[in-house]
Amino acid sequence: IVKLPFTTKQDLRDNYPYGLQAAPPSEIVRVHASSGTTGNPTIVGYTRKDLSVWSEVMARCLTAYGVTRDDTFSVAYGYGLFTGGLGAHYGVENLGATVIPTSTGNTEKHIRLIRDLKISGIACTPSYALYLAETLEKMGLTKEDIGLRIGAFGAEPWTENMRKEIEERLGLKGYNIYGLSEI
């Protein structure tokens, strides 16, 4: 395996913006980018086939977590250049469940939507899940009032202790959703 070539994030940065793109520009239908906080942003172009595979992989992950066509799922990642929001969004749709693209911000409204629309699952960062729990409590509501049962958390590191706290405070089962732009 040591003889197999591989591409590093630095390789992508050194060839910014499109130097290592594996498809011709005419086949690229969407572009995402990293934040660029530690160097040049990593620019990633996606073909229709890439997006189809991505959606299918996300649907499989969600299915493994117990999400079904009968679920309503809030995607509370940011939408835009960051890949998380759209990846989770299209995965939920591919599965046949209902997606609510709540994105980020206005947490009290988000909690009311979770309660009123009977949202059963959420995809967001673990830190936002903890903030949801804090806001829920400040609103005088309980985990029973909102009825979440599944959480797909990612886009930042989190610990097993954070998982336990999120599960306890929101009354759901939390799963780590893995992702990266570069593949």
Mark where each language-model region is.
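AMP-binding/adenylate-forming
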Residues: 47-61, 72-131
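Gly/Ser/Thr-rich phosphate-binding loop
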Residues: 143-183
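Conserved S/T- and glycine-rich ATP-binding loop of Class I adenylate-forming
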Residues: 34-37, 73, 122, 151, ...
